[in-house]
Amino acid sequence: MPIKVQRDLPARAILESENIFIMDEDRAMSQDIRPLEILILNLMPLKEDTETQLLRALSNTPLQVDCTFLMLSTHVSKNTSASHLNKFYVSFDSIKKKKFDGMIITGAPVENMEFEEVNYWEELSGIMEWTKTHVTSTIHICWGAQAGLYYHYGIPKYKRTEKLSGIYNHRVLDRKVPLVRSFNDTFLAPHSRYTEVRREDIEKHPELVILAESEEAGIFLVMSRDGKQIFVQGHPEYDRMTLNNEYHRDLNKGLNPSLPVNYYEDNDPFSVPELTWRNTSNTLYTNWLNFYVYQMTPYLLDDGEEELVHQQYHRLCNKYEKTFRHGKYSNAGRFLSFFTNSSETGSNLTLSHILSL
């Protein structure tokens, strides 16, 4: 999948070195297709690392994706420079009138606090409410998943006796759901958290379905039955060395962390861990983009754009009356479908092309 990012985003060089197709705005414009608009609310402390991880995870289908990074106005990042945020991120106020095909809400290192104690909870709650009407499908990761389950369904989180950290085995529970299509029956995925949500609370909500869980790590993947809200209580996007970096960070802080489970060879914290979960991560995000974003989103995200197309349809009716009024393009919907997704035109056309006819 070609990922559209700003030309000088630091993650670009890393991804290009991995042979991942990255485009800037000029190249994307020349392709004459409507990209999927994905909004990423990055709450992780090391934002540049998370940018790379998520863009990598989104890069595995032929669809073009335009990623917008969102920052909170009620929180000041301690680990990412203001210049980076000002250059590559947008505020919620600047985009809240837009609609997006998909959204990702990341985890955050605030899980030992009650949700209402988090200094940006009110702003985050407003964003999660906004997703109901402005986003086709939203993925929540780790603490973001716990926050989403709490906000949307009132499902609580519980503190664990010790941190859950490592690579855990999981089992798919319902293979008929497209989100887990092509998953193995069992798969590995990283977890890194102090809190958890529990099966018995989720089962009280028939509008939710549990898709994967682990005997050791608990719930991994939950989805609303309409596919609009997806909750991942793990970190499938993590790099090979992310858990290693977290372990040594906590060690240097004097926290006496346990070694991540099933991660280091022979439990040697100075060995290079084996990457055993990348295929799962790629499959999860590819399925999400294909089945819950691309196949479900309207071609035109904004009502204003739809009105412009209807106006253009009626103008063309007057210009080519026989073809449009009495032929197979006899209403604006068919007209729009033809010009945006038709083998007859040879390519998908953008709104600007439709309006220039």
Region locations from a protein language model:
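Cysteine-nucleophile active-site neighborhood
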Residues: 100, 105-174
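Conserved beta-strand hairpin/beta-sheet module of binuclear metal-dependent hydrolase folds
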Residues: 75-87, 96-102, 110-113
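Amide-donor transfer/coupling interface in amidating biosynthetic enzymes
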Residues: 1-74, 88-95, 99, 126, ...
